[in-house]
């Protein structure tokens, strides 16, 4: 198993932020997150392909179109886009959950919410990300908790019991 951290990230982070980043990535390794994502994909991708095939064939037959003709292509594209959207929403929810757990793992290991907060701020600036995108956008497209959600979780950790 490997954890890859790019040199450009290393040079931009202080030691507390880098510790938070490394601990976060190790949290993914410890939790076998790659297998959770792979399991989800192996379950839903065949269902998505089946949906696209059945919906396209049903529409073509209903319209009386030839299944080998070009008229099927727009329907195929539409149903493929719908499948990606409907598979993406729960997949992204799983991804956000995985990322939040890796953040918590990092906080538990480093005991340094300030390092996590600094890391999130720098990553947002470096990646030119919206720190607090609209809720609907996060729900449909967000693969990670928003920067503000992650900072809020780190600050709540700092204020938790025994702090």
Positions of predicted regions on the chain:
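Polar-ligand-bearing catalytic/cofactor-coordination segments
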Residues: 1-67, 81-163
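Hydrophobic alpha-helical transmembrane segments
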Residues: 68-77
